[in-house]
């Protein structure tokens, strides 16, 4: 995986603020790895109580699949949209997958697609970069971007990447050095199989 140097210079708010943004990053759904879809469907009963009434049917949760080298399995699937938002979004608590996991005493991201956890970082065509396409979202507006992006999402980076990769990313941002162009041997973590 190559790293876009912008990752080391980009800014982000100190933390997400759902009160400010109203979860606008959940608009339009997201691409998930097909293995993540299978985990979500296997655990559907855990999430149904947290979903909006119009999104409770598991057969309506996912749409098209496509080849995607940025997914650990090589295949991506889109989450469907209900009322402009991802089917897993709920206006009272944000991501239903995350809320259910936390309420059940599990890791908050156990079921959440990695591309959701990763935002505002994204892997695109093998390059870790910043998703600048969502500039209308509160956290991506210039006046709200106050802290180094990697320090703002340090917990997410540590969760998503192997220890040596996350340590290297975080060390580089704190040193403010030029990043390595390529992290040899990087493979994204595969979704855990509950």
Give short role names for the model-derived ranges:
Residues 1-194:
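Short loop/turn segments that flank or connect secondary-structure elements
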């Amino acid at each position: 995986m190559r790293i876009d140097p912008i990752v080391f210079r980009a800014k982000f708010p100190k933390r997400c603020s759902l009160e400010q943004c109203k979860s606008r990053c959940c608009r339009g759904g997201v691409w998930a790895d097909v293995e993540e879809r299978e985990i979500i469907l296997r655990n559907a009963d855990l999430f149904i109580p947290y979903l909006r009434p119009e999104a409770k049917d598991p057969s309506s949760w996912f749409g098209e699949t496509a080849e995607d080298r940025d997914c650990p399995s090589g295949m991506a699937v889109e989450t469907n949209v209900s009322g402009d938002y991802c089917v897993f979004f709920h206006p009272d608590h944000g991501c239903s997958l995350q809320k259910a996991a936390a309420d059940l005493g599990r890791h908050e991201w156990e079921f959440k697609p990695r591309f959701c956890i990763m935002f505002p970082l994204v892997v695109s065509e093998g390059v870790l970069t910043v998703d600048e396409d969502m500039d209308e979202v509160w956290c991506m507006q210039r006046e709200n971007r106050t802290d180094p992006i990697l320090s703002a999402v340090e917990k997410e980076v540590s969760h998503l990447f192997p220890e040596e990769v996350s340590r290297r990313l975080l060390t580089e941002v704190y040193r403010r050095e030029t990043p390595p162009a390529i992290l040899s041997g990087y493979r994204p973590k595969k979704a855990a199989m509950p």
